[in-house]
Regions:
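Structural recognition of an alpha-helix C-terminal capping motif at a helix-to-coil junction
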Residues: 37-48, 63-75
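Short alpha-helix-to-loop micro-motif enriched in aromatics/charged/Gly
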Residues: 31, 54-63, 88
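Short helix-coil-helix linker/hinge
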Residues: 126, 136-144
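Acidic, proline/glycine-rich intrinsically disordered inter-domain spacer in sigma factors
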Residues: 99-134
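DNA-recognition helix of helix-turn-helix
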Residues: 131-132, 141-143, 152, 157-188
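Short helix-to-turn junction characteristic of helix-turn-helix DNA-binding domains
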Residues: 26, 136, 150-151
Length: 194
């Protein structure tokens, strides 16, 4: 295996946690979580496909690579939606997943840091992303849904409340507790070695 291909394989794994958060948000947005769907399964399928297609990737930067991975994930999510709903290929559905994934990804990136250019800063950014994904996974389910829908998917408190079949006050409480727990978890993880 060529060194550049090994590097691309490693880069693929760096994005696994972020892709799982994004997939979970999109599966919930599309109403697919009630099916026997798992974000980790969809991401695993997307990464297997990405590894098989590594020679086809022509970009040079991490943002290009991350965008390429999100495009593959969007296609996998559209496949899942077709499997559990409409059976025909739907370009609008794939485009919708891609746009929503891109918006959620921007919100996720905004949470972890500003622009960073040095190699060490780049590694720190990936580490922060992994820690944020882990901290989100550690939240109680309803707090995680509220935080992801409001802060990453961009829904208002009222929209999040409607999606969760809760009152706005209840969702505000979930957000408050979720963010407090998330902050505590992240501070604890910052003190832990790698």
């Amino acid at each position: 295996m060529k060194p550049e291909e090994l590097t691309k394989r490693f880069r693929t794994e760096l994005y696994r946690d972020r892709l799982q958060v994004l997939a979970r948000i999109e599966l919930r947005r599309a109403g697919l979580l009630q099916h026997k769907m798992s974000a980790s399964d969809v991401v695993q399928d997307a990464l297997v496909q990405a590894l098989a297609r590594l020679p086809q990737f022509r970009g040079n930067t991490d943002p290009e690579f991350y965008g390429w991975l999100r495009a593959i994930l969007a296609n996998k999510l559209a496949d899942a939606a077709r499997h559990y709903g409409r059976k025909k290929r739907d370009a609008a559905l794939e485009k919708s997943f891609r746009q929503c994934l891109d918006e959620s990804a921007r919100n996720f990136e905004d949470l972890i840091a500003a622009d960073q250019t040095s190699p060490s800063q780049h590694v720190l950014r990936h580490e922060r992303a992994r820690r944020l994904a882990d901290a989100l996974d550690a939240l109680p389910s309803e707090q995680r849904v509220a935080v992801e829908d409001h802060h990453l998917a961009g829904y208002s408190v009222a929209e999040t409340a409607k999606r969760m079949d809760r009152s706005s006050a209840a969702v505000a409480g979930l957000l408050r507790r979720g963010l407090k727990t998330l902050r505590e978890n992240l501070e604890g993880r910052e003190r832990e070695p790698g």
